[in-house]
Amino acid sequence: MNTSSFAVDSSRGKTVDAAKTFVLPDKCFQKHVGCAWGRGNKFTIYPRSQTVNKTPTDTADNKLLNIKQDILLFTPILRKLVNESNGTYLSLQKAAEAAKVSDNQVEFLKLSRQFRSIIRVCLENLQEAAAKAEGIEKNNLLSYITIFYSIECIWHLCEILYIDNIPGDIVLPYLLEWVRFHFPCHEQTAAQLLGACERGSEDHEDYWDTVVGMVVQGRVDVARALLKLHSAGESNEFKLVDNSLRSMPVYSVYGGISTGEFTISWKHWQAECRSKLSSRVLASQPKLELIMKIIMGDYSAFESIRSKYSSWFDILGGWVMFTAPWSRRHELGAAAAACAGMQATGRSHLDDMVRALLEGDLHQVIHEIQQISDNGWFATHLTDILFHCGKLTIMDKHQTNVTSRLRDSLILEYGCLLMEHKSLWSVGLSYLASCPPEGLRRAELILERMPVDTEAKAMKIIAEAKKYELIGVAQSVCRCMCARHLSAGRAGGALCWAMRGRSSAASSRAAHAALAHYTQHAVLPAQDLLLTAGSAMLLSDTLLFLGKYCDFHRLYKTREFKKAAQLLVSLITSKIAPEYFWETLLLDTLPLLESDEPVFTSNDTYEIMLCLELRSSSLDGEKADLLRLALARNLARTALAEGDGTEEGAQ
Amino acid sequence: MGELTATNLFESQTILADHKDLIHDVAYDFYGERMATCSSDQYVKVWDSDGNGGWRLTASWKAHHGSVWKVTWAHPEFGQVIATCSFDRTAAIWEEVGDTAASGSEKGLRTWLKRSNLVDSRTSVTDVKFGPKHLGLLLVTCSADGIIRIYEAPDVMNLAQWTLQHEIPTKVSISCLSWNPSLSRVVHPPMLAVGSDEPNTTNAAASVQGDKTTACNGKVFIYEYSESSRRWTRTDCLSSVQEPVNDIAFAPNLGRSFHLLAVATKDVRIIKIEPIAESAASGNNGATVRFKCEVVAAFEEHYSCVWRVCWNLTGTLLASSGDDCAVRLWKMQYLNQWKCVAVFKNEPVPGDSPPQSRPHTTYIRMATMANPTHMPFH
Amino acid sequence: MPLEVQGTFVSQKISKIRWIAEDYVETKCFFTGSWDDDQNSIKVWTLESPHEEEEVEYPRQLSEYLVDGDVTQIKFTEKNKIAVSLSNGDVRVLEVSLYDKQFPLKEVFHWKKLHNYGAEQCSCTSLDTLEGDIATIGEDGNVNILSGRRGEVMHTIKGADSCSLHSICFIKHTEVITGNVRGHMKIWDVRSTNNKPSAAFLLAGDELAATCIIHHPTQPHIILAGSESGALAVWDLRMNSFPTSLVNAHSAGVSEMQFHPENPHKLLTCSVSGELWEWNMEAMTKSSKGPDGQVMWMPLQDKKSMMVNSLIPALHKSINSLHCDKGRILCGADNEAIYLIKNFKY
């Protein structure tokens, strides 16, 4: 269950990981309660008493309450996400295997983008569904959309900061792209205004907000184009600002200049701007003044516009751009603190995650994303990719590296969660299998307990078990199938599954059942199977006996009496016949003894006689006497024939 | 940006058990598809999942002449078999007989036949459990007079025949037992843990002696089977558990070198039992130390006597219930610490009366308690 | 043009997928059947471009028909009628409207619990159709011959097998071949009343199930069977003894096979190991005289000589079904996705 997070003391100590309390409905339990686990996340609470003395009870205390976790990922739309991301996850495991011998960062980035595109598709599906839905359903979908928007946003930032290969680590262009993509504020208005291309656009109520917004998003060209649409666009004030925007130095790793050189020209440009501002030429245009202040990285100017945005992420790109455009990707903590500090409002969960990410505290990030109620999808996949990229290092209090343990625990939990689902179990299994050895031990427990309602399902479970070399599970499933056929009296199915499971005990049980069936109904079941079974017949003595006995029937039916007789004698003398079968076996000699041509040699006859006397208790007196008589008669005629020497090649 | 943490995480479903007295035990079968209940009304009931989340009563019969304490399922390899134990001093083995033209079969009712009645105990049989399937078809019972009995069905096709293999006197009242489910017979010999609910009087403590172990005030005993001597011997007594024990349960082993045992006593305990390598353990006087035992968690949150402890399938979650009428879920974190992750309580929310019970089979969502301290952020 | 593969996730494991044939235009609609879910269904889909100008076509669901149990087989009895076998033992004949595919499927016939273990449920594992007749098999080991026109059970072979049957194929109107969970193949004359097969032989020595059987489109005496082991076996039924040729093909069970409807030399197979292969079978059907003057057939020992091509990179999960129409192949898989492969050369 993903209701929890890890218990390592968080450095911030912001969150109190208190257990959630749930109110049971119905007030049905007044006294003691007991509990029992069912499959997966289901368990039952029942009223219970330990007292031996019976006390009269009211029957209201007589309800069972089944509790199960509500799993968001099992909704049909999100199942697409689960399945598709499973493919990417498995590719990632392969890439990680390859990365052990050669650098594979490019592949990791490709897979990270694949994950993001899966999230994007999922969001589109959710939006499409939300547009059609109503009521609670719609609310649910909207809350899923919120969840996955945040996930997309965090994943993207994570990719920029940890997975992408950024030239010179200069993060600004990527950061701006992130802000523009996830917080596309004013973009539409800007496009509208530019599209209309009319002088006097300042009449639009959002004109100035849009211009400032474009500046803050680092879209200087758009801002300049918008400024030109102002009716006073040709005035000196506007030209002055336009000039400043145009002449802003833009840092590029490939620009051929060092950071130091760049800083000098940057400082120079800022000084120029400052002098323009202090000359008060812009005093008549406060909005232009604001723009100048912003591009100079003036804190109070940023602070003044903060309230126009829903979050501080909107202005983060601009803040970095106009204060320290040369920032490397792990130097964003201060910028984040500055932007976040501009307005003292309640922090949202997303705030905390983005802050932690920008500060480079991945431990905290993972801690936070575990709180997202996506059943661990995001935490599992993000942790896994960061782990494989070698970007995640988490130490416990003894400074031991526990990163792989964290990764494993998340994957194990996610895998187990999916294995509970009727259809998604095979997806869950592939997660568990990627986490040996514990994953396979858990898979074993769950797989063995998968309800099997058809043979097709049993065969699929066995195929999956064999894929991961869980031979014990495959055999156990076979034995359970055998037991089921056995209790329903279906000998063929029981034999078949016992043999498939190569189980000596089960095949012996099934063979006994078939023999017992024959003694009661005089019909030998599953002859088609017994006559075509190969080496599996050697699994148990009883099965072997049954097979041979079946062959005896075949020979007898095809009137190959000599061969039949030989086989029967060998069955009698081998002494592997079960106790209850001796009567049948001995009586089977009768028709052969009475056949026109003698088929038992005198030696055979002696053997049968010996057995008859040894096992006289298996036959009642009358039958035994009948048999003795037949044996004696056969002995007489064979002795005669053998004495003549006319008996042709006895064996 | 809305709230990312959900408030509705669990759903519940009410089933009218229709027992005429207190229910003592609920047990799921191997697949979690069938559920057996037993009660002081002397009846056992079997419920089958209808495949759509609901449960259908498929059998109900008077199983004993006294309260039925426990019910437990055999591995499906042995067919559809359950065992029950009762205040009437017996334990019984029941088998479902395959589809027949029995009178009830049209109504979906199935027939369970009593295959065997184990009458060796002279006092109430307090617990019954089938052994791990790789040991064959084994059954262990324990009774109020402190005798553990291990039975075996030599022929699994014949459930009428059970032979009493071992009788182990403990001299204290035994309330509960648990098999160690470890599949590795080579590494771990067959192992049983039993718990005693003997009240703590000085007499009782003094009487707990015998075997070769030294006197021990503990209430949980570990028994192991030795292939060579063909005997079950007490190999440890957990001195850390001093209060009467109501329930114990081994966690699935998952290939670990140690075992985890949950104990329901005055609190919820999780005890790590680690076998010590033979060579390091053997003393010179024959009194060997077999295990290193360590209490890895002791939770007093129930503030009262704990009655039940129960592991989920993979042993990652432990549910406990106590006299406080609450069920708590405990979960192991990735660094092996345990913490409470959810509490299920009966407390009514002030000013908001919960809906009355309806005997329906659909799951309804449960609301979390309106207590701000329980929510991480807003 | 290179092969184009396009996957769509559909939130259901797909057990069967079938194009719905059209008379004069390119096929656009298809059926899927699902399995292993809490609620399974048969769906009708169409391929369409969401935006007019775009080339890419995506499947869009037109209708859904809910069923109990898993869909185990879908075969056409007529152009717009399908016979469906279900794991609850039922067999249904459903009709899709010729004019409006969005219209819900209409039930034509419904045989409840056709396969059963008395009161207990038993899976109807597969069926085959021929000219309106339907042959069904089940885990109960029975074979039923149904009339898809009159909706009656024409013949039942009780206990045709003591184990469960998993695959069936009409050889001709009066003859079917069945394969069981152990790879035991039996040929039945459906007119005979003695419940004895006219021939029986084993698929392989490994005692694994025969998962699918088809016959060659132009030479119906050539029978192919896929095994749970991934092997492919070929028989020539004209031979008295049944010399079989066995190729170790896929690394896990063969789930479905189809000869290309327009080119009998092309065989398509898909597998539990997530593979989709095309085979050039031209060599197989060229019989030659052996040294003793007997008609020999090409042994399939070496699959390389058979010209096997993998059409898509192997999926991580089983591909359960395929259906080919001209240059387009549909696949349904256990990763809850359907795949459309375009520009297949045949």
PLM segments and residue spans:
Chain B
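Conserved strand-to-loop turn within each blade of WD40 beta-propeller repeats
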Residues: C38-D41, T84-D88, C142-D145, G195-E198, ...
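Loop/turn segments within WD40 beta-propeller blades
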Residues: V26-G32, T72-G79, K129-G136, S178-P189, ...
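WD40/WD-repeat beta-propeller blade N-cap
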Residues: L16-I23, W61-V68, T111, S116-V125, ...
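WD40-repeat beta-propellers
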Residues: V44-S49, V71, A91-E96, V128, ...
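Solenoidal tandem-repeat scaffolds enriched in leucines and small polar residues
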Residues: R110, R115-E227
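A short helix->beta-strand "capping" segment at the edge of beta-propeller domains
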Residues: M1-K20, G54-R56, R110-L113, R290-V296
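C-terminal interaction modules of eukaryotic adaptor/scaffold proteins
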Residues: E294-A297, E301-P372
